[in-house]
């Protein structure tokens, strides 16, 4: 599981929005942490907020790039984030998806459930709350846009966008609400400063990457994780 935290800084409102991992895996932790975060904000910096919590249940074939060990009930998970008005993101960042995987029952049921989550009750926190999907595969991107249009999409860091021009091309796509570039672009301030405000607002930075800066195998590692933890498990059933 990649436990990276990303932050989106909005210049017109100087607040750092952190996107936390372990939506399913750390469910029991969030049951304790979220009430604490809401009731005792004096324990935390006033310039930070929770932008979303992301993850996928164990054994999701659309998952990818990281191993998942979450076994919590999706309805319980959804109830928790909805109660606190937090966007939930499904980590469906598989890079080796094939056409036959699109009909997977479990993943489609999750998308349907998360797409309509804010319609389930009249809690004031759920007003205009929207959930999303972190995606890598263009095949899956097109499928989600067609079948689950109310889920917003995030371009996954598993694409390993290290070239700044490629990153800008991704930023300018209307398909994505947010883009997570490779961590090696985090400090190219001279280029980041030249971006428009609209472009800047779409960027989320990976803050605690475990790879060393000169790693040349990061993309291959993500693909290996997909092959061994997702595709192979499903193909051997």
Predicted regions and their residues:
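Glycine-enriched alpha-helix->loop->beta-strand junction motifs that scaffold or abut catalytic
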Residues: 147-153, 171-179, 198-203
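Conserved strand-turn element in the central/C-terminal portion of the radical SAM core barrel
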Residues: 96-98, 176-186
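Active-site glycine- and acidic-residue-rich loops that bind
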Residues: 24-26, 181-193, 206-223
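Conserved small/polar residues in nucleotide/adenosyl-binding loops
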Residues: 229-236
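N-terminal basic/disordered segments at the start of proteins
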Residues: 2-49
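Active-site beta->alpha loop and helix N-cap motifs at the rims of alpha/beta catalytic domains
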Residues: 22-30, 51-147, 152-162
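Active-site-adjacent beta->alpha loops and helix N-cap segments on the catalytic face
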Residues: 71, 138-144, 186-198
């Amino acid at each position: 599981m990649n436990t990276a935290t990303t932050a989106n800084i909005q210049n017109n409102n100087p607040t750092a929005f952190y996107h936390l991992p372990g939506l399913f895996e750390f469910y029991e932790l969030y049951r304790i942490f979220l009430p604490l975060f809401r009731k005792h904000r004096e324990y935390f910096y006033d310039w930070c907020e929770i932008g979303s919590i992301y993850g996928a249940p164990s054994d999701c074939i659309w998952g990818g790039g990281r191993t998942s060990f979450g076994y919590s009930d999706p309805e319980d998970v959804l109830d928790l984030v909805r109660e606190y008005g937090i966007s939930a993101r499904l980590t469906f960042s598989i890079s080796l998806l094939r056409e036959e995987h699109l009909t997977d029952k479990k993943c489609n049921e999750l998308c349907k459930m998360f797409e309509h989550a804010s319609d389930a009750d009249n809690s004031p926190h759920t007003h205009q709350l929207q959930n999303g999907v972190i995606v890598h595969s263009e095949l899956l991107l097109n499928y989600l846009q067609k079948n689950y249009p109310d889920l917003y999409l995030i371009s996954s860091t598993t694409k390993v966008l290290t070239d700044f021009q490629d990153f800008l091309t991704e930023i300018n796509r209307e398909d994505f609400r947010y883009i997570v570039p490779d961590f090696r672009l985090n400090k190219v301030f001279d280029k980041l400063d030249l971006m428009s405000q609209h472009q800047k607002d779409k960027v989320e930075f990976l803050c605690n990457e475990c790879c060393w800066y000169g790693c040349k195998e990061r993309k291959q590692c993500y693909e290996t994780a997909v092959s061994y933890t997702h595709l192979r498990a499903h193909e051997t059933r």
